[in-house]
Amino acid sequence: MLVALDEDGQVFNVLENPAPQGRFCCPGCGGLVRYKSGKVLRSHFAHVTLRDCTYFSENESAQHLSLKSCLYSWLINDEQVELEKCLSSIGQVADLFVNNSLALEVQCSSLPISRLQVRTQAYHEAGLQVLWLLGKGLWLKERLSKLHKQFLSFSMNMGFHLWELDDEKKELRLRYLIHEDLRGKVHCLTKIFPFGEGNLLEILRLPFAKQALSHLTCPLDRDLPRYIAQQLYYKSSNWLALQAEFYSRGENLLTKTAEEWYPHIRLPRSAIGFAQIQTDLTLVYQDFDQYYGNIEDKQKQVLYPPIIYRKPM
């Protein structure tokens, strides 16, 4: 942790006061903490004795400490920001609490989906916004995991999106227009923002700002029928379930051509919903299906922000 309470009960921040003196305690549980400074982990506080503290973790990584420090330095000149703000009313600590309304959470490692849902819901029920920024262990690669889907946000101008933090390159990344193809591979665009350049809150609001709209062009996956045949041969549960559904209608997956599977690339879906998205997406999916259902040239697929699908063709 980067903050502690001094003997007068005042918050002490090691980023602003690098040489603390005296006794300090945890802002969450009240237990004694010790100031530490080493070569691997940046200066921080740690509990003197191992005990159950539901607010702060004892195995905080160097990456997590560094990223919180970078974001704090980026925000402090433009916004009211509190580092590791203890929100006792909801039993949580916000990594950074901005303008008394926005919690920025730096998540560097996996966590149970149920835990993410509970933490997000607690913020929402308290009338607070929360934005999760993902460290290296959770960066988006070729596939969207079930956990990734629970970090997704949504806007009409940038579609499904999420944020990544790179401590080595010192940059913030916006992965947007996130789609999945029928093989489960991710298709998206990326914007990069170097740490400290520009107003961070304005950057984080970008998905909802008025802007020139982007698009992404992908060729038709002509090898898709062979891929589906392989999946059925190896008894993929998802494809077997879909084949059973087709059989019930007197159809067969193996007789469909690549063009008949159009669009090959689709919006992410989640059977349990999306923890970060409170908007009803029913019309978004309907607009998407209707738009591509009217496309005659199926040799390519151009992916647009959802606002485009709502406009008459």
Where on the chain are the PLM-derived regions?
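A short acidic/basic microdomain associated with nuclease active sites
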Residues: 72-90, 96-99
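Short, charged, amphipathic alpha-helix that recurs within catalytic cores of restriction-modification
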Residues: 115-128
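N-terminal cysteine/histidine-rich coordination modules
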Residues: 1-76
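Nucleic-acid nuclease catalytic cores
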Residues: 126-158
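Non-catalytic C-terminal interaction segments of nucleic acid-processing enzymes
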Residues: 152-313
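Acidic, metal-coordinating catalytic cores used for nucleic-acid/nucleotide bond scission
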Residues: 89, 111-112, 138
